[in-house]
Regions:
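Ser/Thr-glycine-rich phosphate-binding loops at phosphate-binding pockets of nucleotides
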Residues: 183, 187-188
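Cys-dependent protein tyrosine phosphatase-like superfamily
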Residues: 2-6, 10, 19-178, 190-288
């Protein structure tokens, strides 16, 4: 993968087609899966490469699927072994009300930061990125080549202050922050991609992290099928259509450059201060 530079010096990838060589480009990028009893799509986002030859820090940012079913052993691992102090929950208020309190909610010293990135209407759950028909039409309008990418852009357009709030919560977490939604794919994937880009992780590694969720698709969907809240969304489409596509995240990152001048520009234009941006970058970098 080669990069080209625009006049403003911000990185831009050379096109979605370049991600066909993703596995070769990202040789040596190892996903740090965390095995838990009550969640199946959890990983530490440390040790990812940065553009200046450094790495992201371990035990600073985790991504996950729904944390509702954690066992006592899971809680000990996350809080005592890894040092989680902040849960960044991207689910809707409807989801929170339907699911009830989660095990980490009862742990002293763990802050729950609620940042729903979907409009708070109806029963939006977002297990399947384009499952909601009204939003599906808007998603196709936003980015006809890939409606799921259009759906991701919708988070930025519909709920920018919640997206920014999620990044701010990560930046100022005293210990590790774990970001999650239901499947840990769409909402989580976008917020994590923004955070990693700020930290200087190159686009191909951001895409590799996003696509890694595909390794756990069957387990994620099996888990969600057991939930009354999510089963209808999950059963509405075959598993292959619920897998993350590398091309979708590649397109999203390209659109961030093309439409907004880059991730950092969009964040600062929507209320993330320069101090917050620096805090996020420092927080996620090894050696900080």
């Amino acid at each position: 993968m080669r990069y080209r530079r625009r006049d403003n010096g911000r990185r831009r990838t050379s096109g979605v087609a370049g991600f066909a060589a993703l596995g070769r480009v990202c040789d040596g990028v190892v996903m740090a899966w965390i095995e838990l009893d009550g969640a199946v799509n959890v990983r530490d986002l440390g040790d990812l490469p940065t553009e200046d030859g450094q790495k992201t820090a371990r035990s600073r940012l985790l991504r996950a699927d729904n944390l509702q079913d954690l066992s006592a052993a899971d809680v000990r691992k996350l809080v005592h072994d890894i040092g989680v102090t902040t849960v960044v929950d991207l689910r809707s208020s409807n989801e929170l009300a339907a699911e009830g309190p989660a095990p980490l909610d009862a742990v002293a010293g763990v802050r729950h930061a609620h940042h729903p990135v979907l409009p708070e209407v109806g029963s939006n759950t977002d297990v399947v990125a384009d499952a909601l028909l009204a939003r599906d039409r808007m998603d196709k309008f936003r980015y006809p080549r890939d409606p799921v990418c259009g759906h991701y852009l919708g988070y930025l357009e519909d709920r920018p202050y919640q997206v920014v709030g999620a990044l701010r919560s990560i930046a100022h977490s005293g210990g590790a922050a774990v970001v999650h939604c239901a499947a840990g794919k769409d909402r989580t994937g976008v917020v994590v991609a923004l955070a990693l880009t700020v930290a200087g992780v190159p686009a191909e590694a951001v895409v590799a992290d996003y696509a890694a969720t595909g390794e756990r698709t069957e387990a994620i969907m099996a888990r969600l099928r057991r939930s009354r809240l999510y089963s209808r969304d999950v059963n509405s489409k075959p598993a292959d259509l619920q897998r993350p596509r590398a091309e979708t995240m590649a397109a999203f990152l390209e659109q961030m450059d093309a439409r907004y001048g880059g991730v950092a520009s969009w964040l600062t234009d929507h209320g993330l201060s320069a101090a917050d941006l620096d805090a996020l970058r420092v927080r996620l970098r090894a050696g900080a």
